[in-house]
């Protein structure tokens, strides 16, 4: 059977750390959607390992790792990460695989991404989406319009050449003249095809066979539910299904196989890019949280937007994903605050609303209702058991559980693997 780890906010919740730790209990770790717009940073023995494509479970040398069919893969980035693993002495051979059905992100897609952002912003950031400019949206657009290329197409040279040439021609028609050496790119991808061969498998068959063999599969979600193409704050979303449904379409598995849904929740809220953010704090509180939590994007390096925890968002994402347990991360970052707040409800025109609104105009007019909590003003990094937490921290955790209706089983109190409290009695 399978378990899935999903972000419950706007990304950057700390999913990679939990995947790294829990992967020790699984035979297979798989990513189902997204591409190099994901950024997971894992700290092991004081050393940082940043991954954008390869699942965080690669650090478990007993687990196979899959880049699933729902992903979009930029091969230069993939090979750079593989080299990084090799340089760090991490064994990946024979256990890192790429789906033959995954779509390819070309440098062309990244160029188009940047041009579209510039087109939207028109010199300002008011209308831009705030993408990572990694070519993710344009690649998914090529996929949806049936003009993209998949990993398996690398091994059909004539088809690859014809489709790739047509793809470039179509982009020239849309964006005008821009420099792009088609022949050089085709030659480069001929070389990539040979380099990639040892990694390519039919991942759909592989995963379903793994289930038949009684193996345990951990699905590593990328981005987050509030960036989901359907359920996020459209159009300020990613281009894939980053909620639980994406696991089935992005891996080719039955919903019945997914039995545990773990929502990862940062103890406050962060966001990269444009779009609404109801609990955002553009003041000394936001600045202090950003500094204490080192809130800068793994993929972009941009300073993240900061706000208090939003329980309305958490109830919404929990409803969509049917979370069975939560992982509360970065609780230690709140240790310096005298007062901590949670946004518990939204009011629209004076009335409390029951659900997260689809309309961004409605959302912009919502007033956040806050509850305040006393801080604990002490270092939590040494805490290894729930009972060792100060009462103020326990009360904060308890209130989140009450507001969302899901138990918090894992609590992060630092960046290292060892800084994770596990409430085993709740599992």
Swiss-Prot record:
It catalyses: IMP + L-aspartate + GTP = N(6)-(1,2-dicarboxyethyl)-AMP + GDP + phosphate + 2 H(+). Gene3D superfamilies: Adenylosuccinate Synthetase, subunit A, domain 1, Adenylosuccinate Synthetase, subunit A, domain 2, Adenylosuccinate Synthetase, subunit A, domain 3. Keywords: Cytoplasm, GTP-binding, Ligase, Magnesium, Metal-binding, Nucleotide-binding, Purine biosynthesis. The active site is at 12 (proton acceptor), 40 (proton donor). Mg(2+) binds at residues 12, 39. The keyword Ligase applies. GTP binds at residues 11-17, 39-41, 304, 330-332, 412-414. Binds 1 Mg(2+) ion per subunit. Pathway: Purine metabolism; AMP biosynthesis via de novo pathway; AMP from IMP: step 1/2. It is found in: Cytoplasm. GO terms for cellular component: cytoplasm; cytosol; phagocytic vesicle. IMP binds at residues 12-15, 37-40, 132, 146, 223, 238, 302. Its cofactor is Mg(2+). The keyword Magnesium applies. Its EC number is 6.3.4.4. GO terms for molecular function: adenylosuccinate synthase activity; GTP binding; magnesium ion binding. GO terms for biological process: 'de novo' AMP biosynthetic process; adenosine biosynthetic process; IMP metabolic process; purine nucleotide biosynthetic process. InterPro entries: Adenylosuccin_syn_GTP-bd, Adenylosuccin_syn_Lys_AS, Adenylosuccinate_synth_dom1, Adenylosuccinate_synth_dom2, Adenylosuccinate_synth_dom3, Adenylosuccinate_synthetase, P-loop_NTPase. Substrate binds at residues 298-304. Homodimer. Belongs to the adenylosuccinate synthetase family. Plays an important role in the de novo pathway and in the salvage pathway of purine nucleotide biosynthesis. Catalyzes the first committed step in the biosynthesis of AMP from IMP. This is Adenylosuccinate synthetase. The gene is purA.
